[in-house]
């Protein structure tokens, strides 16, 4: 693991929080609670200590991108039209990517006045349940072959070139793409793309999703902690599904606790852990920034690519 981080500056929490002058946190604890994943934990001091310095760094990266585009336009002797600043957020299932992404969306929108900040998840680019079932890929859901990567790359290419797009929407409740529902993305100043697969090797070996990113962030944690968080999340999903027969997880609520635990542990080991070890974690060093979370969900180390 040490060799993997040779090209990164390791910064501890105490040092990182000093890299941004103390300002008023631009959201309340109730707002924070409303955007966090239901099995995640985050307090306002995490916003102040970790995320405000991170937004400051995003400002630096964005300015560098704009300066480069301006210089390129002088070199090419033509105008380069404005492009959205695209941020990729990756990491394991249950590690807290969604909380990080939603929080960044709010903080960026409130830091860059008048900026339009959109967030999409790659869940919307999963193949529909029926397609996965037909191809016998239900046990590979979340693996590279379960996504329509061409559609994802086509979306990013269109957005980068100034086109409006409509993309599918995924529901964890029905465990499938929602029929006849789309998310419209129109001329964002910032676009956050969150998903377990955003740094992975392309199927055609020529074009990476991450080729479109101006900044990439990997949310990391020790495997044993992620497993605990996953099992907690599975149990909470069942609690939410208890009175909803249409919820995918409702079928598990009729089982005994040992049966439920066995299913959750097997799903973690055979699907999520296997996917993490083979496809997700090996892409970690492609990130510009790695946020490492401790057992209490707080970020204790930050790795910044040199």
Curated annotation (Swiss-Prot):
Its EC number is 2.7.1.33. Keywords: ATP-binding, Coenzyme A biosynthesis, Cytoplasm, Kinase, Nucleotide-binding, Transferase. One of its GO terms (cellular component) is cytoplasm. It is found in: Cytoplasm. SUPFAM superfamilies: P-loop containing nucleoside triphosphate hydrolases. One of its GO terms (biological process) is coenzyme A biosynthetic process. It is an enzyme of class 2 (transferase). ATP binds at residues 91-98. It catalyses: (R)-pantothenate + ATP = (R)-4'-phosphopantothenate + ADP + H(+). It comes from the Bacteria. GO terms for molecular function: ATP binding; pantothenate kinase activity. InterPro entries: P-loop_NTPase, PanK, PRK/URK. Pathway: Cofactor biosynthesis; coenzyme A biosynthesis; CoA from (R)-pantothenate: step 1/5. Coiled coil: none annotated. Belongs to the prokaryotic pantothenate kinase family. NCBIfam families: panK_bact. HAMAP family: Pantothen_kinase_1. This is Pantothenate kinase. It comes from Streptococcus suis (strain 98HAH33). The gene is coaA.
């Amino acid at each position: 693991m040490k060799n993997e981080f040779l090209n990164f500056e390791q910064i501890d929490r105490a040092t990182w929080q000093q890299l941004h002058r103390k300002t008023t946190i631009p959201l309340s604890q109730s707002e924070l609670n409303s955007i966090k994943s239901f099995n995640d934990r985050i307090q306002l001091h995490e916003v102040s200590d970790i995320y405000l310095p991170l937004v400051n760094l995003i400002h630096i990266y964005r300015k560098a991108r704009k300066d480069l585009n301006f210089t390129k336009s002088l070199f090419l002797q033509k105008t380069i039209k404005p492009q959205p600043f695209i941020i990729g957020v990756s990491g394991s299932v249950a590690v807290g990517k969604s909380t990080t992404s939603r929080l960044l969306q709010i903080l960026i929108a409130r830091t860059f006045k008048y900026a339009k900040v959109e967030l999409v998840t790659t869940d919307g680019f999963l193949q529909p349940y029926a397609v996965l079932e037909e191809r016998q890929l239900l046990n590979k859901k979340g693996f590279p072959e379960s996504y329509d990567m061409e559609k994802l790359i086509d979306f990013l290419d269109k957005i980068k070139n100034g086109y409006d797009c409509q993309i599918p929407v995924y529901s964890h409740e029905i465990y499938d793409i929602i029929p006849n529902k789309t998310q419209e993305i129109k001329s964002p100043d910032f676009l956050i793309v969150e998903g377990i697969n955003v740094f992975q090797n392309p199927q055609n070996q020529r074009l990476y999703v991450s080729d479109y990113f101006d900044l990439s962030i990997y949310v990391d944690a020790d495997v044993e902690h992620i497993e605990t968080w996953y099992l907690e999340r599975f149990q909470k999903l069942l609690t939410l599904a208890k009175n909803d027969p249409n919820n995918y997880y409702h079928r598990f609520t009729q089982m005994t606790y040992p049966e439920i635990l066995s299913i959750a542990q097997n799903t973690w080991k055979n699907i999520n852990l296997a996917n993490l070890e083979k496809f997700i974690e090996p892409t970690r060093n492609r990130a510009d920034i790695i946020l490492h979370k401790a057992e209490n969900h707080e970020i204790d180390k930050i790795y910044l690519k040199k």
